[in-house]
């Protein structure tokens, strides 16, 4: 089983415009609302690829039933810590050139009691998990150390995967050795101090993670594909050419597919190929909708990997 831990769920409102004109009237051409959160997106991706998944994290009571309905329909088992209040709303504004502008809310505060409940719940659920994924931001008022506290208490036998910004990543790395991280180019540069100009720079930058005990680095290069490295072997997979509707959720889709590959024990090349196929398939959907398996399989058949 794959466990996902989502500390900061969101309702993502994706707004389509001809172009975004700041300080002027903008007319909406399309709008899609999805019940989201990075680790919840991972859970959906895992389930769509046919593997069992349990989703936990904080969930705000006023929208909890809707979130759980959406996730249950995807075949995901839900076991959240209920909190008073409303789920934050994030706005994703996309123009006809696929330029994305994001306006993200921070969410409501979570009490110390609820924080302790999630630490215990994640610990308990991880006892039956093979892989645990924690990703995304934290609600208002939570210190980055909370990432470390959750991860520190997970079962010692579970493989831990983290996709988070630098401050939360550092807290996670201080808690235990991580099985895999998934930085994008900006996150990789910020963490390592290495400017990414060519593929070999990705390998050099990844060494900073290996020094912290990380086993695998899955580096997302956007439209250029991705690199998967363990410090000894490194592979590159270029994305397939597709019509891009929205890049939101592509990284979460990559994490989902990579975790499924890890769970099934496939070689590094296949983990990478599956991750790139899922991420590429995700950008063909509107809003924050994730990939569908038919599109994933079609793109997968077109991809090639190369050893660096």
Residue ranges: model-predicted function:
Residues 1-56, 64-66, 238:
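Glycine-rich phosphate/adenosyl-contacting loop at the front of the ribokinase-like
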Residues 3, 54, 79, 133, ...:
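Structural detector of well-ordered beta-strand residues that form the stable sheet scaffold
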Residues 24, 48-129, 297-308:
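Conserved N-terminal subdomain of the carbohydrate kinase-like
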Residues 44, 91-93, 225-229:
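Short beta-strand scaffold segments in enzyme catalytic cores
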Residues 46, 184, 251:
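Short, conserved phosphate/pyrophosphate- and ester-handling motifs at nucleotide-, phospho-/glycolipid
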Residues 102-104, 129-136, 163, 182-187:
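Short beta-strands and strand-loop turn motifs
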Residues 145-232:
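Conserved phosphate/ATP/ADP-binding segment of small-molecule kinases
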Residues 171, 199-308:
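Conserved phosphate-binding/catalytic region of the ribokinase-like
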């Amino acid at each position: 089983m794959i466990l996902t831990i989502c500390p900061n769920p969101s309702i993502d409102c994706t707004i389509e415009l001809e172009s975004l004109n700041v300080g002027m009237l903008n007319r909406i051409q399309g709008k899609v609302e999805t019940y989201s959160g990075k680790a919840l997106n991972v859970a959906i991706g895992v389930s769509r690829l046919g593997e069992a998944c349990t989703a936990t994290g904080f969930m705000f009571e006023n929208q909890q039933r809707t979130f759980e309905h959406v996730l249950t329909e995807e075949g995901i088992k839900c076991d959240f810590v209920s909190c008073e209040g409303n789920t934050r709303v994030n706005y994703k504004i996309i123009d006809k050139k696929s330029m994305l502008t994001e306006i993200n809310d921070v969410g409501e505060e979570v009490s110390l009691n609820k924080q302790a409940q999630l630490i215990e719940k994640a610990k308990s659920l991880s006892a039956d998990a093979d892989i645990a994924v924690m990703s995304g931001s934290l609600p208002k008022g939570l210190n980055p150390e909370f990432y470390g506290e959750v991860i520190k208490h997970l079962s010692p036998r579970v493989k831990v995967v983290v996709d988070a910004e630098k401050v939360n990543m550092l807290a996670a790395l201080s808690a235990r050795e991580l099985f895999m991280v998934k930085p994008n180019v900006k996150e990789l540069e910020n963490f390592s101090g290495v400017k990414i100009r060519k593929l070999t720079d990705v390998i050099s930058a990844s060494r900073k993670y290996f020094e912290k005990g990380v086993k695998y680095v899955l580096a997302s290069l956007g439209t250029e594909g991705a690199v998967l490295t363990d410090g000894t072997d490194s592979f590159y997979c270029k994305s397939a050419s597709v019509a891009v509707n929205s890049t939101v959720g592509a990284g979460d889709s990559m994490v989902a597919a990579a975790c499924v590959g890890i769970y099934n024990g496939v070689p590094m090349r296949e983990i990478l190929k599956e991750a790139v196929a899922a991420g590429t398939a995700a950008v063909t959907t509107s809003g924050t909708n994730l990939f569908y398996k038919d599109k994933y399989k079609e793109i997968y058949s077109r991809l090639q990997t190369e050893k660096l």
